[in-house]
Amino acid sequence: MSRYRGPRFKKIRRLGALPGLTSKRPTPGSDLRNQSRSGKRSQYRIRLEEKQKLRFHYGLTERQLLKYVRIAGKAKGSTGQVLLQLLEMRLDNILFRLGMASTIPGARQLVNHRHILVNGRIVDIPSYRCKPRDIITTRDEQKSRALIQNYLDSSPHEELPKHLTLHSSQYKGLVNQIIDSKWVGLKINELLVVEYYSRQT
């Protein structure tokens, strides 16, 4: 299944706010989650919607998300918590959380077009897994810096999560540590996502 490129407002009406996909939010009364035909959502539907929230927020294909779930399942600790950490530490998401891109698809485009460096080297893989002490900068070119400056100027200037530091005048971000679950940028019940996949096998 490919990455979603359809109407974004349609998705947030169905699933609620998806800040990684769009800065728009569902208007009061437009949220369809509580308007299912039966009047009551099944447990399967609830798990499916949580999975879809995760997929659309981070801009993943079904295959990519399944791969992350499997990696998280083999790691020590809570599968759901590890899954969120893996997704939050992706380079495209780190750029988004730093305010260097307005959405995760926008961040992915910056990476694909080779505007971004990690520790002084160009990285053009959006799924690159960032680590503590990584330094994220832009190429020293006018076009690259102009793109980032435009995003920084239009950023809502929300409080940065504790695992990141931004030096906006230098177009530089620092990864201080692995993200703590309370700083995840999406309201999600990750256990329902894990349950969804465990019941598919």
Swiss-Prot record:
<comment type="subunit">
    <text>Part of the 30S ribosomal subunit. Contacts protein S5. The interaction surface between S4 and S5 is involved in control of translational fidelity.</text>
</comment>
<keyword id="KW-0699">rRNA-binding</keyword>
<dbReference type="InterPro" id="IPR005709">
    <property type="entry name" value="Ribosomal_uS4_bac-type"/>
</dbReference>
<dbReference type="InterPro" id="IPR002942">
    <property type="entry name" value="S4_RNA-bd"/>
</dbReference>
<keyword id="KW-0687">Ribonucleoprotein</keyword>
<feature type="region of interest" description="Disordered">
    <location>
        <begin position="15"/>
        <end position="43"/>
    </location>
</feature>
<dbReference type="InterPro" id="IPR022801">
    <property type="entry name" value="Ribosomal_uS4"/>
</dbReference>
<dbReference type="Pfam" id="PF00163">
    <property type="entry name" value="Ribosomal_S4"/>
</dbReference>
<feature type="domain" description="S4 RNA-binding">
    <location>
        <begin position="89"/>
        <end position="149"/>
    </location>
</feature>
<dbReference type="InterPro" id="IPR018079">
    <property type="entry name" value="Ribosomal_uS4_CS"/>
</dbReference>
<dbReference type="InterPro" id="IPR001912">
    <property type="entry name" value="Ribosomal_uS4_N"/>
</dbReference>
<dbReference type="InterPro" id="IPR036986">
    <property type="entry name" value="S4_RNA-bd_sf"/>
</dbReference>
<comment type="function">
    <text>With S5 and S12 plays an important role in translational accuracy.</text>
</comment>
<dbReference type="GO" id="GO:0015935">
    <property type="term" value="C:small ribosomal subunit"/>
</dbReference>
<comment type="function">
    <text>One of the primary rRNA binding proteins, it binds directly to 16S rRNA where it nucleates assembly of the body of the 30S subunit.</text>
</comment>
<dbReference type="GO" id="GO:0006412">
    <property type="term" value="P:translation"/>
</dbReference>
<dbReference type="GO" id="GO:0019843">
    <property type="term" value="F:rRNA binding"/>
</dbReference>
<dbReference type="Pfam" id="PF01479">
    <property type="entry name" value="S4"/>
</dbReference>
<keyword id="KW-0934">Plastid</keyword>
<keyword id="KW-0150">Chloroplast</keyword>
<dbReference type="GO" id="GO:0042274">
    <property type="term" value="P:ribosomal small subunit biogenesis"/>
</dbReference>
<dbReference type="GO" id="GO:0009507">
    <property type="term" value="C:chloroplast"/>
</dbReference>
<comment type="similarity">
    <text>Belongs to the universal ribosomal protein uS4 family.</text>
</comment>
<dbReference type="GO" id="GO:0003735">
    <property type="term" value="F:structural constituent of ribosome"/>
</dbReference>
<keyword id="KW-0689">Ribosomal protein</keyword>
<keyword id="KW-0694">RNA-binding</keyword>
<protein>
    <recommendedName>
        <fullName>Small ribosomal subunit protein uS4c</fullName>
    </recommendedName>
</protein>
